[in-house]
UniProtKB/Swiss-Prot annotation:
It comes from the Bacteria. GO terms for cellular component: cytosolic large ribosomal subunit. The keyword Ribonucleoprotein applies. One of its GO terms (biological process) is translation. Belongs to the bacterial ribosomal protein bL33 family. PANTHER family: 54S RIBOSOMAL PROTEIN L39, MITOCHONDRIAL (PTHR15238), LARGE RIBOSOMAL SUBUNIT PROTEIN BL33M (PTHR15238:SF1). SUPFAM superfamilies: Zn-binding ribosomal proteins. The gene is rpmG. InterPro entries: Ribosomal_bL33 (IPR001705), Ribosomal_bL33_CS (IPR018264), Ribosomal_bL33_sf (IPR038584), Ribosomal_zn-bd (IPR011332). One of its GO terms (molecular function) is structural constituent of ribosome. Gene3D superfamilies: Ribosomal protein L33. Keywords: Ribonucleoprotein, Ribosomal protein. This is Large ribosomal subunit protein bL33. It comes from Azorhizobium caulinodans (strain ATCC 43989 / DSM 5975 / JCM 20966 / LMG 6465 / NBRC 14845 / NCIMB 13405 / ORS 571).
């Protein structure tokens, strides 16, 4: 059986509020860590969310 191309990842807020989004990425084409600006409802502003592993 072949390895799956997409993996689930967690995007954790850089504002240290504990807010995270769960999304998926293609691990074959996107080898570097994802950094996105998304809304943090606890901080009530847009902050950077960095990719971490789902435990």
């Amino acid at each position: 059986m072949a390895k799956a191309a997409t993996i689930k990842i967690k995007l954790l807020s850089s504002a240290d509020t504990g807010v995270f989004y769960v999304t998926k990425k293609n691990s074959r084409t996107k080898t570097d860590k994802i950094v996105l600006k998304k809304y943090d409802p606890v901080a009530r502003k847009h902050v950077e969310f960095r990719e971490t592993k789902i435990k």
